[in-house]
Curated annotation (Swiss-Prot):
Listed EC numbers: 4.2.3.5
A GO term for molecular function: FMN binding
Function: This reaction introduces a second double bond into the aromatic ring system.
GO CC, one annotated term: cytosol
Name of this protein: Chorismate synthase
Record keywords, A-Z: Amino-acid biosynthesis, Aromatic amino acid biosynthesis, FAD, Flavoprotein, FMN, Lyase, NADP
């Protein structure tokens, strides 16, 4: 599986083409839209999410509700484009019109792609950078992840995500799967403990009042993965490495870990390695899951646990110092409409990015043209864990 996204933040639409999805997989736009809706929620989101009502249109690769095995094209319309038509139009404009263009950006924002992107592509109006580097692109990636999740669900592989920290406020509780599934989306900061949730809201409110932003940590879990997906024989075939690359490619993500993550550096090996056990019903399993479901870059049958670190959003209503690229004079950075905290939404994005990487690895590991063929191969791999 692979995909390509296109579109600007305030352009007409986002488009994504997904290749490699097996044939005969049932897909409905409404199922994708449920995932899109989750991305738009979360405490701390800005006014943009009050304008956009993300709904996908599937324009190729699906017929009568089932995939054909050909590339799937999905379109997400940007409703806000109606307010930006003159600024983000496709047609050429005169030099005079360009000089008088509203919303031109020459004061780059610290922590964003503005300045370096302008240097790389020789853009004097940094809006040309901002529009594509915006996290609006993650709407397309959630659509890809939603298709991936539909595929994984057919293979009895399940995805979940949650927030574990916002601005230093942590929810480190351990919850059983059923409690997690029933409660996580009832909360606008995507944590289980309501007392902790309120502390997080208070932290977000304080940052917003101060014109600031805050980041946090999210966690993604993948349940019921077959064993030995990924490979140790080459660096680029290790599944945890691929997931790590996918996670840090999300806007504002600065770190990734698995299982206990960086805490593993504080403990002796005897407390970190997961002991191997065997049961006649389920086969090989581990007595713990400190390593987050991976050994040697391969799945070991335990739940995959991925932790992603998101920095505070760089657009601030109390802007930091910057320099105008034309005059070279000191200025406060440009203010662009933004969120004060996008960590809850980022947990949804991270879940869908991981879903794609897992689905991609599955379809590479088990070469299948249609979903029934893929299911049979997955069942065979699961038997291997018992019979080996």
């Amino acid at each position: 599986m692979k995909y390509l996204t296109s579109g600007e933040s305030h352009g007409p639409q986002l488009t994504v083409i997904i290749e490699g999805v097996p044939a005969n997989l049932e897909i409905k736009a409404e199922d994708i839209n449920k995932e899109m809706f989750k991305r738009q929620g979360g405490y701390g989101r800005g006014r943009r999410m009050q304008i956009e009502k993300d709904a996908v249109e599937i324009v190729s690769g699906v017929r009568n509700g089932y995939t054909l095995g050909s590339p799937i094209t999905i379109v997400v319309t940007n409703d806000d484009f109606t307010h930006w038509r003159n600024i983000m139009g496709i047609e050429p404009i005169s030099d005079e019109e360009r000089d008088n263009m509203k919303r031109t950006i020459t004061k780059p924002r610290p922590g964003h792609a503005d300045l370096i992107g302008g240097m790389k592509y020789n853009h004097r109006d940094l809006r040309n950078v901002l529009e594509r580097s915006s996290a609006r692109e993650t709407a397309a990636r959630v659509a890809v992840g939603a298709v991936s999740k539909i595929l994984l669900e057919q293979l009895d592989i399940h995805m979940y995500s949650r927030v574990v920290e916002i601005g230093g406020i942590k929810d480190e509780g351990l919850y059983d799967t059923e409690t997690f599934k029933q409660n996580i989306d009832k909360n606008d900061v995507r944590v289980i403990d309501e007392t902790i949730a309120q502390k997080m809201r208070d932290k977000i409110d304080a940052a917003k009042k101060d014109g600031d932003s805050i980041g946090g940590v999210v966690q993604v879990m993948v349940e019921n993965m077959p064993v030995a997906v990924g490979s140790y024989v080459q660096y680029d075939r290790k599944l945890d490495g691929r997931i790590a690359q996918g996670v840090v490619s999300i806007n504002a993500f600065k770190g990734v870990s698995f299982g206990e993550g960086f805490k593993a550096a504080e403990k002796p090996g005897s407390e970190i390695q997961d002991e191997i056990l065997y049961d006649n019903e389920i086969g090989f399993y581990r007595g713990s899951n400190h390593l987050g479901g991976f050994e040697g870059g391969m799945t070991n049958g335990m739940p995959i646990i991925v932790n992603g670190v998101m920095k505070p959003i760089p657009t601030l209503y109390k802007p930091l110092n910057s320099v105008d690229i034309n005059t070279k004079e000191d200025f406060k950075a440009t203010i662009e409409r933004s969120d004060s905290c996008a960590v809850p939404a980022a947990s949804v994005v991270c879940e869908h990015v991981v879903a794609f990487e897992v689905a991609k690895a599955i379809t590479e590991e088990f070469q299948s043209n249609h979903i029934d063929q893929l299911k049979a191969q997955i069942d065979e791999r699961r038997r291997l864990n018992i019979e080996f």
